[in-house]
């Protein structure tokens, strides 16, 4: 993942230069990881990457690393909420448990995300119901 590679590169760099230039020209092709079938890599790789960065970063970045981990847990849970319920139930429950294990860090989140995290941990049925409704009404039936 690009994020992990950038973290390692910048961690080892003695200096860096900012250039306002984007060399990437992403083209999403049929069958790419973005549009392909959902699998365990799609679910757990972003979480693993954030956890690796959190474990490797210094104290001055711990809070930012924790926020990044919490946000990706919220995002992945939301994605699993709109996917096939039966197929991803165990994964959704596992992500919920990972989020619940980080409960003491919820105070780092924005008010909105703190509310979402609490709903996922304390009333997941309510989150799933309201989130699916939100996706149907305001996102045209798709969330990504």
Listing of model-derived features with the role each one plays in the protein:
Residues 13:
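Carbohydrate-recognition loop of C-type lectin domains
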Residues 1, 18, 45:
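Short, contiguous, pocket-lining structural segments
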Residues 17-19, 64-65:
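A structural signal for short, well-ordered beta-strand segments and their strand-loop junctions
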Residues 21-30, 36-61, 72, 82-103:
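Catalytic core of nucleotide-sugar-dependent glycosyltransferases
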Residues 82-144:
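Membrane-interface aromatic/basic loop that binds lipid-linked glycans or pyrophosphate carriers
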Residues 55, 71-74, 117-118, 143:
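Active-site anion-handling motifs in enzyme catalytic cores
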Residues 1-8:
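Acidic donor-binding loop at a coil-to-helix junction in glycosyltransferase catalytic cores
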Residues 67-79:
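Amphipathic alpha-helical repeat scaffolds of TPR domains
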């Amino acid at each position: 993942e690009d994020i992990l590679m950038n973290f390692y590169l910048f961690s080892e760099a003695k200096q860096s230069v900012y250039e306002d230039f984007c060399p990437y020209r992403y083209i999403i092709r049929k069958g790419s990881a973005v549009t392909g079938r959902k699998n365990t890599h799609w679910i757990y790789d972003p979480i693993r990457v954030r956890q690796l960065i959190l474990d490797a970063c210094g104290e001055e970045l711990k809070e930012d690393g924790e926020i990044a981990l919490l946000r990706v847990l919220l995002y992945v849970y939301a994605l699993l909420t709109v996917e096939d319920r039966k197929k991803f139930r165990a994964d959704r429950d596992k992500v919920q448990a990972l989020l619940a294990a980080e409960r003491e860090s919820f105070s780092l989140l924005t008010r909105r995300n703190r509310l979402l995290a609490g709903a996922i941990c304390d009333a997941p049925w309510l989150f799933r119901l309201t989130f699916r409704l939100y996706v149907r009404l305001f996102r045209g039936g798709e969330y990504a």
